[in-house]
């Protein structure tokens, strides 16, 4: 049997649990990429689920995925404008979500009807995890990440 995919790990943490989309994405990425992020870091991401706990903001799973991209592409001492690789990855992830789901807005995403899924968030979070794994593995011309 091959290595488990990121989206499968996200689903294990998200479907049938009390974890929000953000918490599931954080825990799965931390484990999958061997990031060894601290409990303090987990707490920082914990309020990002449910559209920053208000449903009026950006999808929590997307927000955590953006943080993971930054963590894995930024160099020590580098500013945002210097991290072109991360910026390109962020653009690819944003384009994917907007093209696939039409919005980044949590409450609008929760209102989608997805055949075969009781909760549309499960489908959306799974899709974000698949795209994140593709991007970080070097898909679409991005450099191969050295974390796997």
Task: Give the ranges of each region predicted by the language model.
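Polybasic, low-complexity association/targeting segments
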Residues: 1-17
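An acidic intrinsically disordered interaction segment
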Residues: 17-37, 92-99
């Amino acid at each position: 049997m091959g290595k488990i995919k990121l989206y499968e790990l996200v689903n294990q943490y998200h479907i049938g649990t009390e974890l929000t989309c953000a918490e599931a994405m954080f825990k799965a990425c931390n484990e999958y990429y061997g990031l060894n992020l601290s409990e303090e870091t987990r707490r920082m991401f914990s309020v990002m689920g449910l559209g920053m706990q208000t449903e009026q903001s950006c999808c929590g799973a997307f927000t955590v995925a953006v943080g993971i991209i930054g963590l894995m592409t930024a160099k020590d001492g580098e500013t945002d404008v210097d991290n072109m690789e991360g910026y390109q990855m962020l653009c690819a992830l944003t384009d994917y979500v907007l093209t696939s789901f039409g919005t980044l807005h949590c409450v609008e995403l929760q209102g989608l009807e997805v055949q075969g899924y009781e909760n549309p968030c499960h489908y959306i979070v799974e899709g974000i995890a698949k795209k994140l794994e593709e991007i970080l593995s070097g898909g679409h011309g991005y450099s191969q990440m050295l974390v796997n």
